[in-house]
From Swiss-Prot:
GO molecular function: DNA-binding transcription factor activity, RNA polymerase II-specific; RNA polymerase II cis-regulatory region sequence-specific DNA binding; zinc ion binding
Predominant location: nucleus
Protein name: Putative zinc finger protein 355P
Gene: ZNF355P
GO biological process, one term: regulation of transcription by RNA polymerase II
One Pfam family it belongs to: zf-C2H2
Keywords assigned by UniProt, alphabetized: DNA-binding, Metal-binding, Nucleus, Repeat, Transcription, Transcription regulation, Zinc, Zinc-finger
Native source organism of the sequence: Homo sapiens
Family of the protein in this entry: Belongs to the krueppel C2H2-type zinc-finger protein family.
Location of the protein in the cell: Nucleus
Zinc finger (C2H2-type): 72-94, 100-122, 128-150, 156-178, 184-206, 212-234, 263-285, 291-313, 335-357, 363-385, 391-413
Cellular compartments per GO CC: nucleus
Annotated ranges, domain KRAB: 1-64
InterPro entries cross-referenced by the UniProt entry: KRAB (IPR001909), Znf_C2H2_sf (IPR036236), Znf_C2H2_type (IPR013087)
Amino acid sequence: MRDEVAEKEKADINVTLVFQGYENTPIMVCVDGIVFSKPDLVTCLEQRKKPWSMKHPGLTQHNIVHTGDKPYKCKDCGKIFKWSSNLTIHQRIHSGEKPYKCEECGKAFKQSSKLNEHMRAHTGEKFYKCEECGKAFKHPSGLTLHKRIHTGENPYKFEECDKAFYWVLSFTKHMIIHRGEKPYKYQECGKAFKWSSNLTIHKRIHTGEKPCKCEECGKACKQSLGLTIQKRIHTEEKPYKCEECGSSNLTIYKKIHAGEKPYNCEKCGKAFYCSSNLIQNNIVHAEEKHYKCQECGKAFKKSLDLNVHKIIHSGEKPYRYEECGKITHSGEESYKCEECGKGFYCSSSLTKHMIVHTEEKLYKCEECGKAFKWSSELTIHQRIRTEEKPYKCEECVRVFKHSSKLNEHKRNHTGEKPYKCEACGKAF
C-alpha cells in the first residue's frame, strides 16, 4: 500500500514539473520532434499518458520538418517538395501561369510575395533600413546584401581561383566565366551567350525592337542602360566622377590610372580596359558573319557594317559621325563639351574629346617611352614597329594598319560616296 502511495506522489510531482515547464508555452508545443496542441498535452499528462501516443490535425505537416520527407512530387519533371504549396508554385514554371497581377502596370507574377515586392516599385516604400548608414531598401534581400559591404563578408567562395563574392549572382556569373559556358543560343543566327539578358538584347538587333523610350525627347533604346544614359543628358547628372582627373566616366578612368587592362584576347594577346573593346577585337578574328542583309543576302561581322550597307538599298543619306561610325537620323549632337561647347553624337566621343583640354598623356609606349593622349594613337604607333596590319578587306584581302583606311577602301567595292558637294551635288 505504501509503495502505491509513493508511486502516485512521484507521478504527481512529475506532472507538476511538466506543467511548470509548459505553462508559458504557446498554443502548439513541440516535444521530442512531435507537435501537440497545449490543451491536448495537458489532458494527456493529467491522465498519466505518454504525449507522443496522441495525434492532432497538423502534426503530420510539422513532423516533415524533423523527418525530412518530401511527399509532393512534380509529374512533369520529378522534382520533390516538402509542402504542397511549394509544389503548386513550382508547377507554374511548367504551365507558365502567373495568377498575381499588378493593377498599376499589368505585370504578372507566379507568387503573391513577388507581387508585394513589385508593388513597392510603384509606392516607393522602403521598409528595410541599414542601422550603420541609414540607407533604406524595398526588399530585405537588398538590405542583407548591403550589410555585407559594412561587414566585409563574402560568403560565396570560388574554389578554382579563391575569389569570394558577397552576392550569389556575382558568384554564379563568375563561375560561368571560368567554365566558358554559353547556354543561351539564338536560333536565327546561331550566336550563343553566357547570360539570358545578353540574348534578349541581341534579339532586338534582328527585330529592331526598342522598348525603352525616353519620356523627355521620345528617343527609343534597345536596353534600359541606354535609356538611363539618355535621361542623364536631359538632367545633366554625372553621378560617377573620377577623383584623379574629374572625368565622369569613372570605371574606365580608374582602370586607365591604375594601368589595369582586365580584358585579354586569347587569339592575339591584346588587353583592353573595356569588355566592349574586347568584343570588337574578337569580331576581327571571327570568321562568322551573323548580320545578313535581307535585300541582297550579303553578310557582315558587325551590325554597324550592315546598317551602313542598308543605306545603299534605301537611298537614305543620314548623318554619319566619322570618329565612331555611328549613324543618326536627326543630326542632333546631344553631347556637349562644357569647356568649348563642341557637340558630339555619342558619349564616348565626348569622353575622348575631353582629353584635348588636359595635358595628361596616359598611354605610354613600353618600347621607347613615348606617351600619347589617346589609346588609338599608341596602338597606331606600336604598329609602326611591328608592321601589324590587322584590318583585312573581305572582298579583296587587302590589309591595313588603321580601320579608317579599311573603311575608305571598302567604298571602292560598295560604290558609297558619303561626301557631297553642296554647290553642284557631286558626291565623292
